[in-house]
From Swiss-Prot:
It comes from Stutzerimonas stutzeri (strain A1501). Belongs to the TRAFAC class translation factor GTPase superfamily. Classic translation factor GTPase family. IF-2 subfamily. Residues 337-504 form the tr-type G domain. InterPro entries: DNA-bd_dom_put_sf, EF-G-like_DII, IF2_assoc_dom_bac, IF2_II, IF2_N, P-loop_NTPase, Small_GTP-bd, T_Tr_GTP-bd_dom. This is Translation initiation factor IF-2. One of its GO terms (molecular function) is GTP binding.
Length: 837
């Protein structure tokens, strides 16, 4: 065979020479140069090494299977034949040296066992011969004794008890032969066919395990008759036994204890009561609640169903995780005095932000859109008498929930009332929020520098709301102030700090941070940003925080001026970055130990929120069926709403959903915090909605879709404008009302006949003006008897378009000839009038 070098072999197998030399060295070959010759044996060694290194088996096959198939034909009857095919399969296994050695050992052991068996057999035969000889000798001696015995002895022997005879016979009887021990057979190597055949037979073979003895039952004749015999070829007849259960049915209803959480599905409730789900569904249908097997029930409904079905109910709280979290958050430490949190509330345009600007020496109100506050703002101010934290709330009617959150998170409420305006609706609402939160009120009577200011009117109005001034014997201080010139501001701060001293506000700075989310928004460059007011403990950068259904690690903290801070103590407002979403305003913020616990609680709250929402959605469906029966006929204005902060979004959704009447309604199909994105534009396109952006703008992708599809997208920065535009749109959807204006009345004085028009009424116009081709009514005794159209109007045989009051004319009524003297003809017109909400 032609000799091959390493280089040529590398070209054949398409691999680099260096790699081939490396593999040959790993295989134990001595090749180091590309020009060296490779023999066939070296190739085989290299191939075996490569196969073994890649997990392939290089051994020869150890098993060979031979199959044989023979076909024969059998004649049945005249010309009919049957083909018989016989298949045989044999498998030969090549045994290894270890198996051969084991077989030799088995043969040697078998030979030794055979020799031992032969020896034992010889000993057994000798023992049997000796026993037989002894038995013959005993029988001979017994016969001789019987011949010489007297007749009396025979009688006494006949009267012996049978038991003694049996005992004597048993004693004289030889021992039973012991079963010959056979040498144990040594199993030979088994082929695959034998093992497969044994497995097949083992499936039909009864189990050889020892079973516990069954309790015996006395079978009656009927039982014997009920059984039947089943015989088969080569098998014994077997008598079947009737199946009998081993339990008794309960004689009375079983009362079970049913554990019900805040929500439970119909299937879970049925399982706990040990009844079928169909019975629960049927029972709820009778109660008037059509449900399905997977429907979620609230706790009250499930309790009612379980009690009506006769079971005991155990109400279970699903807040195990929350309670565990509360236990972990308990902290004992030294409490110190903290700064008060003061919320400024009042009616819109009464000067809340201007008052805060004077205190902070800032100019926030100048830069606000529309001159009104639309966000809740948090600031802390260092005064000569100590630090005070202020929350500035919007005064517009739409921000009710925002003001309620401000009252919840505060210690003291400053109620700002304009001296020239008096007590307004939002002033009353602020008083209600403060009383509901149980916080003291300090009234700031603003705009005292105006000539039309009337402080006494303010006192009378607030006294009607149970806010009694100190001068009248109450406990509410009234401080006249002017945010413009600064009159009374120092007295106001002094009154606030005096209230704070009375409250004895304490906090534990060494504890983990705990607070409340004041506001949240989605920043394009920084992600979710939440404004947090720390109420207790210290919040530090790097802490893992939990806010409602959101969690995250605090990546950065900023104060109200946008400067980064490392930590925030009690009563300090900060903005935090790092949450996984924008939390709801008003959510509690807590610092937890690790991310695992935060994620677990957040997911639990998300699932709980979803379950409660589904249960509430289903609860009132049947009750409101008549109210919602005509909902399909309503015209709906769909809106996709995006706002800059969570509080504004909530306020806008509440205000817009409150607009409408029985014919038109507003539906916010999508809402969120942040800019208008491409997905928002697609949602508006799919739902035929209008895109509203409140203090946000659309990105390039969204603008492209809006331009291509011709969507209506509008930007706003004042809440008044968006509400007014939606009202106008709803007014346009209402359509128009048709009103009738009476133009004139003519009294019939005479009736003439005309071959062309039939009856012609000679009339005197008594009121207004009569026009031709206008709808008319014929009144007789002030009762309408005909309604039609004025076809002909003449004066002195001339066709005229109109006839004024005090003039005579002839009137021809189309398709009506029953005109009589004394009738009145009323001419009117129909006018469409725009409707309003």
């Amino acid at each position: 065979m032609t000799q091959v070098t390493v280089k040529e072999l590398a070209q054949v197998v398409d691999t680099p020479v260096e790699r081939l030399l490396q593999q040959m060295r790993e295989a134990g070959l001595s090749h180091t140069s590309a020009e060296q010759v490779v023999t066939d044996n070296e190739k085989q060694a290299l191939l075996a090494h490569l196969k073994s290194s890649h997990g392939a088996k290089v051994d020869e096959p150890r098993k060979i299977t031979l199959q044989r198939k023979t076909t024969t034909k059998l004649k049945v009857g005249g010309s009919k034949t049957i083909s018989v095919e016989v298949r045989k399969k044999k498998t030969f296994v090549k045994r290894s040296a270890e198996e051969i050695e084991a077989e030799q050992r088995r043969e040697l052991e078998e030979q030794r066992a055979a020799e031992e068996a032969a020896r034992l057999k010889a000993e057994q035969e000798a023992r049997e011969r000796a026993e037989e000889e002894a038995r013959r000798q005993a029988e001979a001696a017994k016969a001789q004794t019987a011949e010489t015995a007297a007749p009396a002895a025979a009688e006494s022997a006949s009267s012996a008890e049978p038991a003694q005879v049996v005992a004597a016979v048993e004693a004289a009887a030889p021992a039973p032969e012991r079963k010959k021990e056979e040498p144990r057979r040594v199993e030979k190597p088994r082929s695959d066919d034998d093992e497969r055949r044994d497995r097949k037979h083992a499936q039909h073979r009864p189990s050889l395990k020892t079973k516990a003895p069954l309790a015996r039952t006395v079978r009656s004749g009927e039982d014997e008759a009920d059984g039947f015999r089943r015989g088969g070829r080569g098998g014994k007849s077997k008598l079947k036994k009737r199946n009998q259960h081993g339990f008794q049915s309960p004689t009375g209803p079983v009362v079970r204890e049913v554990s019900i959480g805040e929500t439970i599905t119909v299937a879970e409730l049925a399982q706990q009561m040990s009844v079928k789900a169909a019975e629960v569904i049927k029972f709820m249908f009778k109660m008037g609640s059509p449900v399905t097997i997977n429907q979620v029930l609230d706790q009250e409904t499930a309790q009612l169903v379980a009690e009506e079905l006769g079971h005991k109910v155990k109400l279970v709280s699903d807040n195990a995780l929350e309670e565990q979290l509360a236990e972990l958050l308990k902290f004992e430490g030294e409490s110190v005095a903290r700064a008060p949190v003061v919320t400024v509330m009042g009616h819109v345009d009464h000067g809340k932000t201007s008052l805060l600007d004077y205190i902070r020496r800032a100019k926030v109100a100048v830069g606000e859109a529309g001159g009104i506050t639309q966000h809740i703002g948090a600031y802390h101010v260092e005064t000569e008498r100590g630090m005070v934290t202020f929350l500035d709330t919007p005064g517009h009617a739409a921000f009710t929930a925002m003001r309620a959150r401000g009252a919840k998170a505060t210690d003291i409420v400053i109620l700002v009332v304009a001296a020239d305006d008096g007590v307004m609706p939002q002033t009353q609402e602020a008083v209600q929020h403060a009383k509901a939160a149980g916080v003291p009120i300090v009234v700031a009577v603003n705009k005292i520098d105006k000539p039309e200011a009337n402080p006494d009117n303010i006192k009378n109005g607030l006294a009607a709301l149970d806010v009694i001034p100190e001068e009248w014997g109450g406990d509410t201080p009234f401080i006249p102030v002017s945010a413009k010139v600064g009159t009374g501001v120092d007295e106001l701060l002094e009154a606030v700090l005096l209230q704070a001293e009375i409250l004895e506000l304490k906090a534990t700075p060494s504890a983990p941070g705990r607070g409340v989310v004041v506001e949240s928004r989605l920043d394009k460059g920084r992600g979710p940003v939440a404004t947090v007011l720390v109420q207790d403990g210290t919040l530090r950068q790097g802490d893992m925080v939990l806010c409602g259904v959101n969690f995250g690690r605090v990546r950065a903290m900023l104060d109200e001026n946008g400067k980064p801070v490392k930590e925030a103590g009690p009563a300090i407002p900060v903005e935090i970055l790092g949450l996984d979403g924008t939390p709801e305003a008003g959510d509690d913020l807590t610092v937890v130990a690790d991310e695992k616990k935060a994620r677990e609680v957040a997911l639990f709250r998300q699932g709980k929120f979803r379950e409660v929402k589904l249960a509430r959605a289903h609860a009132g469906k049947l009750e409101n069926i008549f109210e919602t029966m005509g909902q399909d006929e309503k015209k709906t204005l769909n809106i996709v709403l995006k706002a800059d902060v969570r509080g504004s979004l909530e306020a806008l959704q509440g205000s817009l959903n409150g607009l409408g009447n029985d014919e038109v309604q507003v539906r916010v199909v999508g809402g969120g915090v942040g800019g208008i994105t491409e997905s928002d534009a697609n949602l508006a396109l799919a739902s035929n909605a209008v895109l509203f952006g409140f203090n946000v703008r659309a990105d390039a992708g969204a603008r492209k879709i809006v331009e291509a599809e011709g969507l209506d997208m509008r930007y706003y920065n004042v809440i008044y404008d968006i509400i007014e535009d939606v009202k106008k749109a709803l007014t346009g959807m209402l359509g128009s009302d048709v009103r009738e204006n009476i133009l004139g009345i003519a009294e019939v004085r005479d009736v003439f006949r005309s071959p062309k028009f039939g009856a012609i009424a000679g009339c005197m116009v008594t009121e207004g003006m009569v026009h031709r081709n206008r709808p008319i009514r014929v009144l007789r005794d002030d009762v309408v008897i005909f309604e039609g159209e004025l076809e002909s109007l003449r004066r002195f045989k001339d066709d005229v378009a109109e006839v004024r009051a005090g003039m005579e004319c002839g009137i021809g009524v189309k398709s009506y000839n029953d005109v009589k003297v004394g009738d009145k003809i009323e001419v009117f017109e129909k006018v469409e009038v725009a409707r309003s909400l």
